[in-house]
Structures are given as C-alpha cells and as structure tokens.
From Swiss-Prot:
Protein name: Siroheme synthase
Ligand binding (NAD(+)): 22-23, 43-44
Family: In the N-terminal section; belongs to the precorrin-2 dehydrogenase / sirohydrochlorin ferrochelatase family.
One Gene Ontology MF term: sirohydrochlorin ferrochelatase activity
Gene that this polypeptide is encoded by: cysG
Length: 457
C-alpha cells in the first residue's frame, strides 16, 4: 500500500491553494465543502474566485507565491500550469511539514486526491495511487450508480438512533441485526427522502420493537465457475454480510478475498475420490453454526443446485427448522462453454443441452442410448476419471467416433486450459488434463476455432 487513505477534519482550518484557474477552482470547491478556511494565491483569478471572495467564502492573495503563506496552513495544493512553481510550492510545504497535493504530478505530492462519492456523512474515496485517474473515475461512476442518493440521510438518521439502539439491544449481534434491517428498509429511506416525520417515527418504532429472530440462517450461494467477475451482485452482498463462510475447493481465492474480513472461514473442500470433510459432517457444520444464531453462507462453486448437493444440505436445515435461502450462481457448463467459444445451443447443431454428472450413486446407470442421439450437446461434470467409459458407452450406442469433444480445465479463470479432439480420443485427452475439468461433446464444439475469444485476452 503506497498511500494510507484517511479522512481529514479541515473545518475552520487554514488551507492554501496556489493557482487561480479552472483546476484550482475544482480543488477549491472540495475544500470549501469540507469547511476549510481557504486562501488562494495567484497572479490572476477566474471570475468564480472573485465571486467567492466577495461572498466572504475565501481570501484571495494576488501576486507571486511566498512561502510565508504556508506558516499557518494545515494543507496545501499546487494547481498552476507552471511545473517549476508547483515544484517550489511542494518543496516549501515539505519544509513546513505540511501535506501538499500537486495536480497531475503525484510523485511531487505528499498526498493525492481521490475520486469521491459524497453521501454525507457517508463518504467513499477511490484512488489508483495517481497511476490511472481515469480508472478511478470509472470506478467512482460505477459506485455512484450502486449507492442510492438518500443513503446519506439514512446514515445521518442512524447516528441519531445509536444511543437508543444501544439501550434496546444488549448484545453486539442483536445490534448488528437491527442495523442491517434498518439500512435495507425501503420505507424508512423513502420517508427520510420525503421528510415524512410520521412515517419515519412509525417505521422506526416498528423496527425497534419487533422481536429479533435469534435463530441463525443459512444462505446457499453459488460462486460461479471461477472468474470473480461472474459472482452475482446478490452473492457478493451475502458473503460480505456473513458471520461464517463454509466454502469448497472450487471457490477461487479472488472470490474469498471479497468475503467480510472478520467472518469465520471453514474449508470443506473435496477432490475427486477424496472428501476432505464428509457430506454429513458439512450438513452438521451448517446446522451447528446456524443454531448459534449466526448468519452462515454456504459458498459453492458454480450453481449450488446443479450437481452441488445443495438440495441435500438444505433438507437437513429444513428438518431442523433453520431458515434458509438460495442465491443462484453461473453454472460451470454456461461459464466454461462461453469462455471456450462453444455455444451450448445452435440452430444448426444443437436444439438441447444435457447436463450430466460423471459419477452416480452406487448402482446408477445413464441412459446412453438417448445421450448418443444427434442434435444435442452433452456436458459432463466431474467426468474426467470416467472419460474412457463415456467414450466407450457413447460409441457403443451409436454416437459417431468423429463427434467433436472438448475438455475445459479451470474454466473462466486466467489459468483456463482447453483441449479438443474427437470422441475416439476422449479417454486419451482426459489423461492430459487435471481437475476441475468439464467435458463438452457435440457438433457445437466445432465452432470453437471461430468463436474462441477468451484465449485472445
């Protein structure tokens, strides 16, 4: 970390801007909004500065820069179009032990100005460390669209309630659950926006006085196939609100880095032929943590209801009366095929898709005759160890040996690897790949050479 993000209290503190043009004006607006006692020094000023001075909002010092202007300052900004002058201001500020920002010259500055999302009292600052201001601006714009304009009013109102909430709810967990209910209550937010005092009071009393459910809950979240950018917005919200995250091997490190920092993390990863934690024990972990009153996220790669055993885990919770919900994820078949340039359906080649597990419970047998039919795409999950059997069975039941096949390893991740060939080569191809891998069989695989976009990135 090259810069420490801090929020400075500048109200009624002396600050200096050197420069009287448009760039200096933008910086001045920020300092004035923060309540700074502002002095602006320049040889000439644009009209806005004169208007501010006439209104008593700042002091103008016309003339060359003099180091004595820094004597009482807490903070300075060099915002002229003269690089040498900006450097002199920076060096003088350094000698005075005053933080100084130099516009468009982060290496000459002792602090940099972030992109700001202002929902006062809630403030969000985004910075690229001065390396890419455009990137910081794009991120700010994206965050602006996610944060409602009335969020500041809700945050300010929450500050007024802190004392009462502390008296009403004895434990930290109870208080956190109350605040989470308040911040997502649309009626309260709208009432604050409309300054409807009656509705504000009614909604607040309802939230404070309704009984808190001391039972925990479990949210089954699909993490998607690997690329953290494919995690859904709702999935992200859930892992950032969790007390406990129970996760498996298919959840990438990039996604785990998004988990709430103080959440407990329980790894229950599985590998082909080896279960780190038996399924029954996983069920009991979810049950045990929820019974402690915790918010538990069961985080699974792909989609939890597609070969994720999510249904089995939820049955245990249902039988115990534990509340639960499900956040779907992008399943591996969809993600891996898209990132490999293989459309699962195509008007000319495939009118249906079969998602098939590569291993069944003891005694299970697939309907190989129907699987060998034309005009469909087959996607085998967890089928790497059974690739030779899949090849044999499909050919025995009439699928042409020249049918295109592909195996996708670590789909959608930067380490994705794809190998393709024909059905007669499937067993041999599988020996060159590692788990997790997905097998795709069908005429659509032949489009890969034309549609493969991800490897070019």
């Amino acid at each position: 970390m090259d810069h420490l993000p801090i929020f400075c209290q500048l109200r009624d503190r002396d600050c200096l801007i050197v420069g009287g043009g448009d760039v200096a004006e933008r910086k001045a607006r920020l300092l004035l909004d923060a309540g700074a006692r502002l002095t602006v020094n320049a040889l000439a000023f644009i009209p806005q500065f004169t208007a501010w001075a006439d209104a008593g909002m700042l002091t103008l010092v016309e003339g060359p820069f003099d180091e004595s202007l820094l004597d009482t300052c807490w903070l300075a900004i060099a915002a002229t179009d003269d690089d040498a002058l900006n450097q002199r201001v920076s060096e003088a500020a350094e000698a005075h032990r005053i933080f100084c920002n130099v516009v468009d010259a982060p290496k000459a500055a002792s602090f940099i100005m972030p992109s700001i999302i202002d929902r006062s009292p809630l403030m969000v600052a985004v910075s690229s460390g001065g390396t890419s201001p455009v990137l910081a601006r794009l991120l700010r714009e994206k965050l602006e669209s996610l944060l409602p304009l009335h969020l500041g009013q809700v945050a300010k109102y929450a500050g007024q309630l802190r004392g009462r909430v502390k008296q009403q709810f004895a434990t930290m967990g109870e208080r956190r659950r109350f605040w989470e209910k308040l911040f997502v209550n649309d009626r309260l937010a709208q009432s604050l926006a409309n300054n409807d005092q009656k509705a504000i009071t009614e909604t607040t009393e309802q939230l404070i006085n309704e009984p808190l459910d001391h039972r925990g809950e479990v949210v089954l979240v699909g993490a998607g196939p690997g690329d953290a950018g494919l995690l859904t917005l709702k999935g992200l919200q859930q892992i950032q609100q969790a007390d406990v995250v129970v996760y498996d091997r298919l959840v990438s490190d990039d996604i785990m880095n998004l988990v709430r920092r103080d959440a407990d993390r329980v790894f229950v990863g599985k590998r082909a032929g080896y279960h780190c934690v038996p399924q029954e024990e996983i069920n009991q972990i979810l049950l045990r943590e929820a019974q402690k009153g915790k918010r538990v996220v069961r985080l699974k790669g792909g989609d939890p209801f597609i070969f994720g055993r999510g249904g089995e885990e939820l049955e245990t919770l249902c039988n115990a009366g534990i509340p639960f919900s499900v956040v779907p994820g992008i399943t591996a078949a969809s993600g891996c095929s898209a990132y490999s340039g293989i459309p699962l359906t195509h008007r000319d080649y495939a009118q249906s898709v079969r998602l098939i597990t590569g291993h069944l419970k003891t005694g299970g047998e697939l309907d190989w005759e129907n699987l060998a039919a034309e005009k469909q795409t087959l996607v085998f999950y967890m089928g790497l160890n059974q690739a030779a059997t899949i090849q044999q069975k499909l050919i025995e039941h009439g699928m042409p040996g020249e049918m295109p096949v592909a195996i996708v390893e670590n789909g959608t991740a930067v380490t994705q690897r794809v190998i393709d060939g024909t059905l007669t080569q499937l067993g041999e191809l599988a020996q060159q790949m590692n788990s997790p891998s997905l097998i795709i069989i069908g005429r659509v695989v032949g489009l890969r050479d034309k549609l493969n976009w991800f490897s070019n990135h």
